[in-house]
Amino acid sequence: MREVISIHVGQAGIQIGNACWELFCLEHGIQPDGQMPSDKTIGGGDDAFNTFFSETGAGKHVPRCVFLDLEPTVVDEVRTGTYRHLFHPEQLISGKEDAANNFARGHYTIGKEIVDLSLDRIRKLADNCTGLQGFLMFNAVGGGTGSGLGCLLLERLSVDYGKKSKLNFCSWPSPQVSTAVVEPYNSVLSTHSLLEHTDVAVMLDNEAIYDICRRNLDIERPTYTNLNRLIAQVISSLTASLRFDGALNVDVTEFQTNLVPYPRIHFMLSSYAPIISAEKAYHEQLSVAEITNSAFEPASMMAKCDPRHGKYMACCLMYRGDVVPKDVNAAVATIKTKRTIQFVDWCPTGFKCGINYQPPTVVPGGDLAKVMRAVCMISNSTAIAEVFSRMDHKFDLMYAKRAFVHWYVGEGMEEGEFSEAREDLAALEKDYEEVGIETAEGEGEEEGYGDEY
């Protein structure tokens, strides 16, 4: 089997995790207590969903995941929630005091008390796998636990499981909506670590998803549940080919191979289509061409970033439901002829497609309409650099006055780490600038491009 272990860190990671596992259970017909009436091979078997669930001898299905937080309230909600019997109690790990929005607390002082226990649990899950493929990490980079403990875990996983791929879904601070004053510090410090220790990072941004909820689903005041269910659909589409059988299956490592041209250029934009409410869906014919076009719309992006300001390096289209390869090829051909969607000149093909026959599932009483087919796009675009430059600007304004820095230094961090992380991000912006430049004929050979990477 090609198993995947999910790690949910901090409040954002756990709440996105709740939405994801709720959806996975619905998709596979697994009840909240872990029983699965449709499963014929009790206690194992080589079913495709076993990549995400392990089975006990009694036929109970247990998610291969860990929930970690430095304070108990959010994990307690899982312990008492609808799905409390689904998870093994040892998979829910919580500390006593939180990271207080402080990267240094999550990474150095409080995080390191819990990290060994967490790695122990992850090791147990990994021993249960016959062919562990990699890890999915869910966290927010603006908080303390998600950024600090999340990065600490990624660093330790790189040591223990060097060859396994690590995909990261990170909730990134929005341009206008902020949940903490020190977000810029936490984000810059954690991105510094993400650059090194994760293979693919998918950027999610609450503000962008709020706008999608308002615009496409007519929800006037979206809650985190609305946002997380949308994010869950994206993650479900990405992992559908691991959990179901399809025509063109896509592996976790394949994302990496197809999307990451240089090791540092691994921050992705994601979009999903059709995001449409039940009332509207009734009157629309959502053909493959239509949903493909809407996945490329700037308004569909799950991060506040306009892909028209940059060029695409590669993109992965994951279709699910009633889709045949012929339609996909036609849709992609149309996209290539569009002038608004620009690709870098050194990447002529640029598309990786996956097709899965399992139609998208919707949560009963949720906002999304039940549709026949959907597409999820993960793209690597040079436009994501604007997300970093926005964050760096905010960081600079605060750091010029050394505001709030004493909280970090007091937790055992050195001031040098701030400037080191900031320089790393400046270099990243530069890298993105360089990959977007047109290559002049014949200069690529003799110039040593090997230095930067």
From Swiss-Prot:
A GO cellular-component term linked to this record: microtubule
UniProt cross-references to InterPro entries, sorted A to Z: Alpha_tubulin (IPR002452), Tub_FtsZ_C (IPR008280), Tubulin (IPR000217), Tubulin/FtsZ-like_C (IPR037103), Tubulin/FtsZ_2-layer-sand-dom (IPR018316), Tubulin/FtsZ_GTPase_sf (IPR036525), Tubulin_C (IPR023123), Tubulin_CS (IPR017975)
UniProt subunit comment: Dimer of alpha and beta chains. A typical microtubule is a hollow water-filled tube with an outer diameter of 25 nm and an inner diameter of 15 nM. Alpha-beta heterodimers associate head-to-tail to form protofilaments running lengthwise along the microtubule wall with the beta-tubulin subunit facing the microtubule plus end conferring a structural polarity. Microtubules usually have 13 protofilaments but different protofilament numbers can be found in some organisms and specialized cells.
Protein's recorded name: Tubulin alpha chain
Binding site for GTP: 11, 71, 144-145, 179, 206, 228
Reaction(s) the record says it catalyses: GTP + H2O = GDP + phosphate + H(+)
Necessary cofactors: Mg(2+)
GO MF annotation: an example: metal ion binding
Modified residues (N6-acetyllysine): 40
Subcellular location, record wording: Cytoplasm, Cytoskeleton
Site (Involved in polymerization): 453
EC number: 3.6.5.-
List of residues binding Mg(2+): 71
Reported function: Tubulin is the major constituent of microtubules, a cylinder consisting of laterally associated linear protofilaments composed of alpha- and beta-tubulin heterodimers. Microtubules grow by the addition of GTP-tubulin dimers to the microtubule end, where a stabilizing cap forms. Below the cap, tubulin dimers are in GDP-bound state, owing to GTPase activity of alpha-tubulin.
Keywords (A to Z) from UniProt: Acetylation, Cytoplasm, Cytoskeleton, GTP-binding, Hydrolase, Magnesium, Metal-binding, Microtubule, Nucleotide-binding
Catalytic residue list: 254
GO annotation (BP), single: microtubule-based process
Name of the top EC class for this enzyme: hydrolase
Classification via CDD domains: alpha_tubulin
Native source species: Toxoplasma gondii
Family matches, as Pfam families: Tubulin, Tubulin_C
Residue ranges that the Swiss-Prot or TrEMBL entry lists as coiled coil: none
Domain of life: Eukaryota
Protein family membership: Belongs to the tubulin family.
Posttranslational modification: Undergoes a tyrosination/detyrosination cycle, the cyclic removal and re-addition of a C-terminal tyrosine residue by the enzymes tubulin tyrosine carboxypeptidase (TTCP) and tubulin tyrosine ligase (TTL), respectively. Acetylation of alpha chains at Lys-40 stabilizes microtubules and affects affinity and processivity of microtubule motors. This modification has a role in multiple cellular functions, ranging from cell motility, cell cycle progression or cell differentiation to intracellular trafficking and signaling.
Main location: cytoplasm
